[in-house]
């Protein structure tokens, strides 16, 4: 009986805590510009859009510049345009402003200054964001069919981000002649140890038959500033080093040490329909093979056409002035139209 009473008490306490946490999760309040108030749970603010979960209306996507105020009793991480980070609950002050209530202070902020809000203590799965898209084309005159797949998954924690991306292009010709398949898998860890500066570590595996590359295994790191961080755009520059092992077609393996210069920018709008433009450029001048240069350009524009579904136009350009196999092409360029889903 004693054990039964203790077990019953433990179950009651557990259910009480669960119910309390559930109730707390739905006590955030947003006020629209017209004065309407909505009660729910902040999922995330990023790229000018607040994801807000409600019991009655499901998940809402609210434009940040169309809100008057946001109040949250839970602890959240707040990032501003100048790179400052705060942990605390959110209180209301004047319209178009919030106050971050920290352990020993209150920090007033204009809402246009806030670029990221992430609740602390979310489960692993709820901290994942990403997208997947696919495209297919067939040209009858040339007898060429092409399948394209892309995926991007991001896991966010306090002042850091872990990302996994994958890309695959398979080409089939009716006459069975040479293939132009390409594939890449990349994982990266990005952290902001200083207010505006980031550290990036990257591991990448790729193959490209057009460039005579069976497999390139690469690790690298870079540091740099985030020059722009707003609800409409981001701009980052970085520099570092990369080492790789290359296995070319019909050639001996070789290892390389390269410098790494990188540029990344994003532009986005959440006036329906939502649109994102992302451009990433990496330049690799070789330090172990003087004169060799590699460039990787990836650009994509995505436009939402229904809820979490989007259409994407992607451009990629892989350049190597000295590919592993001297007989291979030095450039591989492609444009892909695809349909995808964000999660």
Regions found by a protein language model. Name each.
Residues 132-138, 151, 164-170, 185-189, ...:
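Transmembrane beta-barrel strands of outer-membrane/channel proteins
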Residues 131-133, 146-150, 182-186, 216, ...:
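Membrane-embedded beta-strand positions in outer-membrane beta-barrel channels/transporters
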Residues 232-285:
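Detector for outer-membrane/organellar transmembrane beta-barrel domains
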Residues 158-164, 192-199, 230-235, 268-277, ...:
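Repeated loop/turn-to-beta-strand initiation elements of outer-membrane beta-barrel proteins
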Residues 23-156, 163-167:
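Compositionally biased alpha-helical segments
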């Amino acid at each position: 009986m004693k054990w039964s009473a203790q077990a019953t008490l433990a179950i009651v306490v557990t259910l009480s805590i669960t119910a309390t946490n559930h109730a707390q999760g739905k006590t955030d309040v947003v006020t629209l510009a017209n004065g309407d108030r909505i009660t729910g749970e902040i999922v995330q603010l990023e790229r000018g859009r607040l994801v807000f979960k409600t019991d009655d209306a499901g998940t809402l996507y609210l434009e940040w510049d169309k809100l008057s105020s946001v109040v949250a009793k839970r602890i959240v991480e707040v990032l501003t345009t100048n790179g400052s980070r705060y942990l605390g609950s959110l209180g209301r002050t004047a319209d178009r402003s919030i106050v971050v209530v920290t352990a020993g202070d209150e920090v007033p902020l204009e809402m246009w200054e806030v670029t990221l809000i992430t609740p602390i203590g979310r489960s692993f799965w709820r901290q994942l964001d990403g997208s997947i898209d696919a495209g297919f084309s067939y040209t009858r005159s040339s007898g060429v069919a092409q399948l394209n797949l892309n995926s991007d998954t991001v896991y966010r924690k306090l002042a850091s981000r872990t990302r996994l991306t994958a890309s695959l292009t398979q080409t089939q010709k009716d006459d069975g002649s040479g293939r132009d398949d390409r594939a890449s898998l990349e994982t990266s860890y990005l952290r902001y140890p200083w207010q505006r500066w980031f550290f990036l570590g990257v591991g990448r595996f790729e193959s490209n038959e057009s460039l005579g590359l069976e497999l390139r295994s690469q690790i690298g790191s870079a540091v740099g500033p985030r020059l722009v961080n707003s609800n409409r755009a981001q701009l980052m520059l970085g520099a570092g080093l990369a080492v790789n092992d290359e296995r070319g077609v019909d050639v001996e393996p070789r290892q390389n040490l390269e410098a790494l210069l990188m540029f990344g920018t994003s532009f986005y709008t959440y006036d329906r329909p939502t649109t994102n433009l992302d451009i990433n450029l990496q330049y690799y001048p070789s330090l172990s093979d003087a004169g060799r240069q590699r460039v990787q350009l990836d650009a994509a524009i995505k436009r939402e056409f229904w809820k979490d579904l989007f259409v994407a136009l992607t451009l990629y350009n892989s350049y190597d002035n000295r590919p592993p196999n001297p007989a291979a092409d030095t450039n591989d360029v492609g444009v892909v139209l695809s349909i995808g889903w964000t999660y």
